[in-house]
Regions:
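Beta-rich carbohydrate-recognition and catalytic domains
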Residues: 1-21, 25-79, 88-227, 236-308, ...
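Short, conserved clusters of charged catalytic residues that mark active-site
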Residues: 230
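Extended, compositionally biased non-globular segments
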Residues: 312-317
Length: 352
């Protein structure tokens, strides 16, 4: 049986104003024994920026900045620079993040040569409304869940809401000469191929969405994926294929449970699935993975309280020997680490 070890929390919120409410969902980059974490820092106003920490070895935090590394600057990100992912391809680091303006959640990116200075390049996901997207979905002959999510968000937030396209990560090598980018339009995981980021215009996306069914890597299909799935860690190139650690969401009435899972994709054609876990890789089981409501002074949780949100949200990995360390957001508040033997995980995936 595949063994996953939970190694505990490595980052908690602090008293610094920019991260009093959360330090979680880190992008991870490994250089030998050095691990760089670019984490989502959340303040009391529920606005996010990017914090920075450095580890020596998989668990030992040796440096943590007391100010944001990347802050909110533009109107499209005025309420949040959230949930970063990072990939090095060639001589450039590509840094992706969810840009939130208080209503719309889109994906933007920045580039860096040294991981010290970042140049923001703007929004890359479709800037079309759900209303417009639904018409394009019809051409793609998508399942009902795509239309259900569109209706839900239009009713809850407004008809002018821009299509939410999140959970973006980049393959560390080009596939057949093209960039390969994983993204998530609810409820599945999709992939897009392109030659240059400048191609990602509204016209490009409209044509892509008309054919979206051709670019779905994974559909939500198992019991622990009942609501949706989404990418987590950037794809890892292995001898057997591309390993993708992703998140799953089970919805039980008003409660949501976020878990981690894994899939192995073909090296030359990542649309081809070699193997996929039929049970979670790991689930929220610890107290620090359960999101509790904020209570006023003197108040306690009622004895019949059940959590509305329990979360493990994998966002980055590091490899030491045969041990794969998985860094994840716990309870939308803190950063924790789990580990698994990489070869054993690959063998398990090849069995499925």
């Amino acid at each position: 049986m595949l063994e996953v070890k939970k190694l505990g929390v490595i980052l908690e919120p602090t008293t610094l104003p920019f991260e009093t409410a959360g330090a979680f969902n880190p992008a991870v980059f490994q250089e030998g024994k050095t691990i760089r974490l670019f984490y989502r820092a959340l303040n009391e106003e529920h606005k996010s920026c990017i914090g920075y920490a450095r580890l020596e070895g998989p668990l030992n935090v040796v440096e943590r900045w007391k100010k944001p590394l990347i802050n909110r600057e533009f109107s499209y990100e005025q309420h949040g620079v959230e949930d970063p992912e990072i990939t090095k391809l060639g001589n450039l680091f590509y840094f992706f993040y969810v840009a939130y303006d208080g209503k719309n959640a889109v994906t933007a990116y920045a580039i860096s040569k040294d991981l010290k200075t970042f140049k923001k390049m703007g929004v890359i996901t479709p800037q079309i409304t759900y209303q417009e997207a639904v018409e394009l979905f019809k051409s793609a002959r998508l399942k009902d869940a795509y239309f259900n999510f569109a209706s839900l968000y239009k009713e809850e937030i407004g008809k002018d809401l821009i299509l939410w396209d999140k959970d973006v990560s980049l393959f560390s090598k080009k596939i057949n000469g093209k960039f390969a980018l994983i993204h998530r339009i609810l409820p599945d995981i999709q992939i897009v191929f392109f030659n240059d980021f400048r191609e990602l215009t509204t016209e490009f996306w409209c044509e892509y969405l008309k054919n979206l069914s051709k670019y779905i890597i994974l559909e939500n299909k198992y019991w622990f994926e009942s609501r949706n799935i989404g990418a987590g860690c950037p794809p890892i190139e292995t001898k057997d294929g591309w390993l993708l650690i992703f998140h799953t969401v089970e919805e039980i009435n008003e409660n949501r449970i976020y878990r981690a899972s894994a899939v192995l994709l073909d090296k030359k054609n990542p649309l081809r699935v070699i193997g996929r876990l039929k049970e979670p890789l790991f689930s929220p089981t610890e107290n620090w993975e359960i999101a509790e409501p904020v209570l006023s002074e003197g108040k306690t949780l009622p004895p019949d309280w059940t959590p509305e949100l329990t979360v493990v949200f994998p966002t980055g990995t590091a490899l030491f020997g045969e041990t794969l360390y998985i860094y994840y957001g716990a309870a939308d508040k803190r950063t924790a680490v789990a580990s698994v033997n990489l070869n054993e995980l690959l063998e398990e995936l090849k069995k499925t």
